[in-house]
Regions:
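Primary mode marks residue(s) on the alpha4-beta5-alpha5 output face of response regulator receiver
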Residues: 15-302
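Hydrophobic membrane-insertion alpha-helices, especially the h-region
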Residues: 1-14
């Protein structure tokens, strides 16, 4: 009898507790493109999302607000560029023809802008700070018609042995004079204006601040002077030698037309040359850290 009565009470409670839930089923909203300054949480592939060598073009890597270490930072968004041509041929003022992805050229310029304005160099050194990578929308975003490309700055090419995550930001690095160590270019040595990069937080002899293709008629004296000017500005120190502890140097090389081997010095027949602007200790000691933005701080010796 008690069991039957309990069952009736439970059934009546269930019958009278008919709650009505107001609303309609739906799906979570799909976000739009990430804002400038968001961080890259996935490591890019060896071709940095530009599709070279059979790699994915504009992969959907994770981009999110910055917390902790990251692989890169969003420097700009190119709206509607997902379906744009990836191969355009152009000819420069010297008559040289290039074929490449125009989105990559735009991203490279946006990377430079994100780093801050560089000083006008009388020689035109290209600073080795950062690399451009490309990230595209997710599958859901593409289905809904989103066709943007996120331009991302990374410390180096995805295939580089020096490519690593970092903390802090490179936004306006050239303006404020502060740079996360993975973005600097260090090497154990420089041979005929070429070098093999190593992480700057490891012991090294050389920090390379710029590379260039000297114009015909360029002089070594002018090259050396402009290198000093560049390093003085990037180190934020009127005396980049730190009273003689360091030496500012340039290296120039060209390809020998007879042997095809790289040879020190300017080309004598008008062929292209290449140059490197770097700094090294005046003694046999090694560096352990970047000199970028060093200012009045002591040299980071090993």
């Amino acid at each position: 009898m008690l069991v039957a009565l309990f069952a009736v009470i439970v059934i009546n409670a269930q019958v009278h507790d008919r709650r009505v839930i107001v609303g309609a089923a739906g799906v979570a909203p799909v976000p739009g493109p990430p804002p400038v300054g968001d961080c890259l949480l996935d490591r890019p592939g060896p071709d940095d999302g530009w599709g070279y060598g059979g790699g994915p073009l504009y992969p959907a890597l994770r981009l999110a607000p910055c917390t902790g270490a990251r692989w890169g930072e969003v420097v700009s968004i190119l709206p509607g560029s997902l379906t744009a041509s990836t191969s355009v041929t152009t000819t420069d003022s010297n008559g040289t023809t290039y074929t490449g992805n125009p989105n990559q050229s735009r991203c490279s310029q946006n990377v430079a802008n994100y780093l801050g304005n560089a000083p006008d160099s009388p020689f035109g050194w290209s600073m080795l700070i950062g690399n451009s990578a490309a990230v595209g929308p997710t599958t859901r975003q593409r289905i809904l018609g989103q066709s943007w490309i996120a331009c991302v700055i990374t410390p180096a090419n995805g295939a580089s042995a020096t490519f690593t995550r970092y903390s802090g930001s490179v936004r306006n690095a050239l303006t404020v004079g502060a740079l996360p160590s993975p973005f600097a270019s260090c090497a154990p040595f420089v041979v005929v204006a070429d070098f093999v990069a190593v992480p700057c937080d490891q012991p090294h002899r050389i920090e390379v601040f710029g590379v260039a293709a000297p114009a015909s008629g360029e002089t070594r004296a002018h090259l050396d002077a402009s290198c000093v000017q560049l390093i003085r500005w990037l180190m934020r120190d009127r005396d980049p030698t730190k009273g003689g502890l360091l030496t500012v140097r340039t290296a120039v090389a060209h390809v020998d037309p007879d042997t095809g081997a790289p040879t020190e010095g300017f080309s004598s027949n008008g062929d292209p040359s290449k140059a490197a602007c770097f700094i090294e200790p005046a003694s046999p000691r090694q560096l352990h850290g970047t000199l970028f933005g060093l200012g009045s701080n002591p040299v980071p010796w090993r």
